[in-house]
From Swiss-Prot:
Recorded coiled-coil stretches: none
Native organism taxonomy: Eukaryota, Viridiplantae, Streptophyta, Embryophyta, Tracheophyta
Family according to the record: Belongs to the kiwellin family.
Chief localization: secreted
Keyword Secreted: yes
Keywords: Secreted, Signal
Full protein name: Ripening-related protein 3
Organism: Oryza sativa subsp. japonica (Rice)
Gene Ontology CC annotations of this record: extracellular region
Domain of life: Eukaryota
Pfam families listed in its UniProt record: KWL1
Subcellular location: Secreted
Protein's UniProt keywords contain DNA damage: no
Family annotation (InterPro entries): Kiwellin-like, RlpA-like_sf
Residues making up the signal peptide according to the UniProt record: 1-32
Length: 213
């Protein structure tokens, strides 16, 4: 009987440890679904986890401001919590292509991209083939001014130069056009990239793959 009681206690202890381990994740998901104090949850579209290997690193509190909403840009809302990421999903080996979400961005002076691209410190007109990558894929500027190949689901492809980081850790300020932090799986392409792929810019988002050129 004593042995059975000991085994039962061990099983109960293990069960309690398991519950304690998963509670923080459950709480985070609850907040992402729209919970949290003040009625403001995580921005739903940005709260979806793109990869189980890349979890949120934190959150920032939204502040609204002078946000250029061109190209379907999402503008920060006061008091809303936005998740941040220090990583991106793993890059596929062998140049097979890494799944990503293509978004639309103007890198021109006065466009919705905010300040000048960080790789070169200069702006690019909408006819140039340039992109920004989520923080993890930007990889500490290692892809600055390097080419990537972007492929649409329909088979079209284009080569574009990386000129900026789509910042997954900061946002909701003037440097980021008062937009939320970038999701962890974004290739932010100029209008020229969308045109070269034959995509409808009004859609604002498209499933693509990308690889280093």
């Amino acid at each position: 009987m004593a042995g059975a009681m000991t085994m039962s206690r061990r099983r109960l202890s293990h069960a309690l440890l398991l519950v304690l381990a998963i509670l923080p994740n459950l709480a985070a998901l609850a907040v992402a679904a729209g919970g949290g104090s003040g009625g403001g949850g995580f921005f739903p579209h940005r709260s979806l986890l793109q990869s189980s290997s890349c979890q949120p690193s934190g959150a920032i509190t939204g502040t609204s401001g002078d946000c250029n909403a061109d190209n379907g840009s999402e503008c920060c809302q006061d008091g809303v919590q936005y998740m941040t990421y220090a990583c991106s999903p793993p890059v596929a080996a062998g140049g097979t292509g890494t799944a990503a979400l293509l978004t639309l961005n103007s890198f021109a002076d006065g466009g919705d991209g905010g300040g000048a691209p960080s790789c070169t410190g200069r702006f690019y007109d909408d006819g140039q083939l340039v992109v920004a990558l989520s923080t993890g894929w930007f990889d500490g500027r290692s892809r600055c001014e390097k080419d990537v190949v972007i492929r649409a689901s329909g088979g079209a492809s284009v080569t574009a130069m990386v000129v900026d980081e789509c910042d997954s850790q900061r946002g909701c300020d003037s440097d980021h056009n008062f937009e939320p932090p970038c999701r962890n799986n974004i290739v932010d392409g100029s209008p020229a990239v969308w045109d070269a792929l034959g995509l409808n810019k009004d859609d604002g988002e498209a499933q693509i793959t990308w690889s280093d050129a």
